[in-house]
Every structure is written in C-alpha cells, then in structure tokens.
C-alpha cells in the first residue's frame, strides 16, 4: 500500500497538509521472518537551507500539494493487533502489570514518532529502502540524550534469556528491558522509539526538539509553519 508509486493509493488519504493520516489494515505476514510487522510510517522531508534537519531527506521546495504525491503519505498500523494492550491502560495499577509486545498504544506512538522525524534509538545503518541493524554500537538517531545500543547483541541476549526461562513465572521484566549502551553502561528501555522488550512511554528533550522542528518547517505536515517564502512544487 505505502510502497506503491503509481499514485493510485493517494485517493485513500486526506490532505497531509491538514491531517496526519493513520491507516489501519491487516499486514501481509513476511515469508522470510519469524516476527510480524506492527506498523510502518513515512519519514518527513526537510527543506534545504537554514531549516534543514539532520537525518531527513532534503528537498528544495517548502510546499507540496496532495495532488502532486505519487504515494500514500501516512502511517500504517497492523489492524491484527488493534485490541492488544498492556494492562497498565486497563487495571490502573490495581493488579500486577502484564506486558504485551504488540501493545497498540506503543505501536501508534512509535510510528507517529517516525512520522514526525524520530529515528530508532538503537544503532542502525541506512540502506536503499530504509534502515538495518548496525553491526557495531554508535549514535544514529541524532539525539544525544537517548542512549544508543547494539540491537543485534540485545536480540541474541533476549533469545538466550527466554530459552533459559521456559516458564513465564520465572521471567523478570527488568531483565528484558535492560540494555547496554555504547560505553558498556546498563539502562532501562523506556523510549517510544525502541523495540520490544521495552516500557515505551518516554520522549526525550532532543526528540521533542526534532518533533517541533518538523511541525514548524516540514512540508506535508499539518499546522502553522515558520516563514520559508512562497516557493512550491509546480
């Protein structure tokens, strides 16, 4: 749906300059992966010049009309998990916390974070059609206040930990949310731009700065803009 470049799916979205479009549909399960995609989002564009924001695709124009789009500019959520929630939203802390890695609230916050200019907090490298886990540990999200870590190493740790704890009662959520940053220090994963297993509720100050910058400067994003002249796509 989102990768189609023929323009046929643009009719399904409202004007991105006025609305953030969140599409709900059942994702096709990948044939080559044991995991299932929960959501996907377009990243915003940034205008070349003084208002350019690192980590985003640069363009020369400050205004784009919906009629000029060749693809559905939006965030998409896998509707298969629309009713999946961790118990922190339902029991108000009256009983023990039951974690759900497919929590729809976290997925939506995560994808809207991407839509407004945020990258994953773990180390990743850019490839032709997106990003992939990095082999080493470095800061790749353009936010100095979000500790980075090696996602591949964490996945290996997670797989080993779960294989050694076959019964659910023996699993400690604190062991699963633990990460090791590039300096070898441990921290708890709570940022919305991390993957499971994490608490998924924090946004850092640097991330808020990026979001504000996108809201005030990027085309195809609703809301008032900082004056960038009147140049637009023809």
Residues of each region from the PLM?
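Metzincin-family zinc-dependent endopeptidase catalytic domain
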Residues: 1-109, 115-135, 139-143, 147-148
